Amino acid sequence: MQFFQLIGTQRSGSNLFRLMLNEFDEIYAPHPPHLLSTFYHLQKNYNDFDKLVSDMVKWVKFNPIKWNNIPSEKTIKNHIKDNNIFEVFRVIYTHSNPKFWCCKSLQNFRFNNDPNFKKLQPIYIYIYRDGRDVASSFKKASIGEKHIYNIAKQWNEDQRKCLEIKKSTKDFNFFSVKYEDLLSDPALIINNFCKKYGLSYNKKFLNYYKSKESKKASTSGGLWRNLSKPLIRNNKNKYKSELSTNEILIFESINKKELQKLGYELVNSDSKLFSSFTSGEINKFNLINSDLKKEAYENQNDFEKELIKKQKIIISKDS
């Protein structure tokens, strides 16, 4: 079994690509419950490893998009090679014995240097999108940063880390997907992917939006409502009408190098870009960001709030 790990920033087409991959019989690509990012820093609180396994299984059960096949705690304990969360993570994903398994927890790039994560021998799929469109999307979403400054800083950090991983990873273990290319020629992207990893190419992936997994995703919250629709090929350059002139300027000032490295042209000339921001400006941005995040949370639908509540109960209990 080989392990595909998607990396990058949310709102960049990762769920779209996951659903396309999930149409291949050889690939198991469920919606991610973000097991590692949730439990990695909590594991030190667990004196009982069995309790950690139990909580990780419960966490998957409360994932916003339901899993069809979750192994029992007993099965997990019988199949792990070591008592660590990376092994629990592996067994949960590989329970159905797929040829390839895929995790869409994009922030798992943070575990790149962990020896136990390295043992899983991940094949990184770096999916990236024009950061200004990512920012425009985050401003409307119920998750993530909300002020353009904070979104820009997060996007910058994520791209830098992913590009560092690319430099230090063997070519076979790294595959880049530019979101805009996926929109314009998905067949080319998927065909190249299949050739590289020995998959049998078929056009079934284009019907991802008709799949049961897609229907489950699109009815599970506003974040994924487009997933039950055919590919929206013009879903790019929206920032030009959705971000203000100043927001674009702030984003480009922080991300000039990363945007250009990834093949995106700037709207603003170098002479217009801010060289820095004062501590007062940054404090103001952070306060606005905090208020907007609270507002976004309050605007989540009841289904999303209830699931978050159930998950919080799991990790707030004495371990």
PLM regions and their residue ranges:
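PAPS-dependent sulfotransferases, especially Golgi type II membrane carbohydrate sulfotransferases
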Residues: 1-5, 139, 200-319
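A generic secondary-structure signal for well-formed alpha-helical elements
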Residues: 24-31, 190, 197, 201, ...
